Amino acid sequence: MRKIINNPEHVVDEMMEGYISAYSRYYVKHPDVNGVILKQRRKDKVALVIGGGSGHEPMFSGFVGKGLADAAACGNIFASPDPNTIYQTAKAVEQGKGVLFVYGCYAGDNLNFDMGEEFLNDDGIQTAHVRVWDDVASAPQERIEDRRGIAGDVFVVKIAGAACDAGLELEEVVRVTEKARDNTRTIGVATAPAQLPGVEQPIFTLGEGEIEYGMGLHGERGVLRTTWEDADVLAEKMYKQILDDSDLKTGDEVCVLVNGLGSTTITELAIAFRKVKKLLDADGIKVYDTDLNNYCTSQEMGGFSITLFKLDEELKKYYDMPCYCPYYAKGELTGNTGEAAGGQTEDVQIKSEPEFDVNDVEAAEIVRSKAGILEELNAADARNMLLYIADKIIAKKPYL
C-alpha cells in the first residue's frame, strides 16, 4: 500500500513537525527529543506524562491537552520511546508534585518507562506509573497484568488528567487512575492488515473474507480467525466476551467507545454501536456517554474495538471534568450522550421571526391575529398566506 510520505526513515520526525506546527497554539516540541509538551499547564500539580510508539495517532501525542496529559513521549512507529526521551519529556513538565506515567502494557514500554522513572528518581523527582491492560483477548483473567493496553487508554488518560487537575497528591492520583484502568475492558477485531512505512509486506495477512478477533494493535495474534460476519454478529460476540470478563450487572452505568483501527469509517462504527446499545439496554446497563471515533489506531488497519468503562460516583466526577485537545473534548459544552438524566430528553423549542415583511398589511394582520404561532389557522388565512408567498416567489423569479 502506498503511503503519503517522503523518506520512510523520517516519518516520525516529519509527522511531529507537522503536528506541532498545526497546533502551535497548544504545543511545543521538546528541543532534544520527540516529546510533545503542553504550553499552558497548571502549576503546583502532579504532572501526567503518557507515551508509546508512534503510528497509533491520535494516541498518544493527540491526547496532550487541558485536563488530559501534560506531555507525551513518542517513539518510532510501533516502538517504545527510549528512556532518555521519557526522562527528558517528563523533566520538562514536572512541577514539584511528582510525575505519573500512563502507558500501554508492552514489554518495551514497561522496560523503558521503568528506566525513565529511575533517571527521574535519581534527580529527586517522585514518580509512579499505571500500565493500561484493557485487552481482554490478550491474556486470561488470572494473568491480567500480562494483558495489552489498547483503546482503553482513552478513558484511563481522561480520568488521570482530571485527577491531576483536581490537585490530588500523587498517591491519590494513582489510586483513582488504577480504579479507572481496572474498570475498563476492550476487545478488537481486525478486517484488514496494516503496513509499516517503507516495508513491502503488511504486518500480518488475512485471507479474502477473513476476520480475526482479538488482534493486537501491532499485529499480535488474536484468539479466533473466522469468515466474514455481519456487524451485528461481530458486535454481539465482542460484547459478550467483555461481559464475561467483567463484573457488569443490571443497573450499572458505562461509557462506551467504539474505536476505529485506522481505515474503518464512522458509518461502520455507528452501525456497530447500534447493536451494542441494544445489548446494553437488554441487560439493564445504562449508557452514560459514547464516543465513535478513531482514537487508538494501527496505521491503515481495518476493523474496530469496543471498550466499556464502568463508572461509579467517584469516576463519574472525574469523567465530567472538562478537558480539551484537538482530538478529544469533554465538559459543559460537550455534555454527555447517554442517559445520565434518567433517559429524559427535552425538545428544543425554536422561536423564529416571520420571514415576510410585517409592514405588509395583509401578512401582518395574519401574524397579529394568530400571535405568531398560528394555532387556529382557518381557510381564509391559509389562502392569504399562500397567495402572499406565491407573489414573493414570482417577484424573485429572475433570481431563482
Identify what each model region corresponds to.
Residues 1-400:
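N-terminal loops that bind phosphate or other acidic moieties
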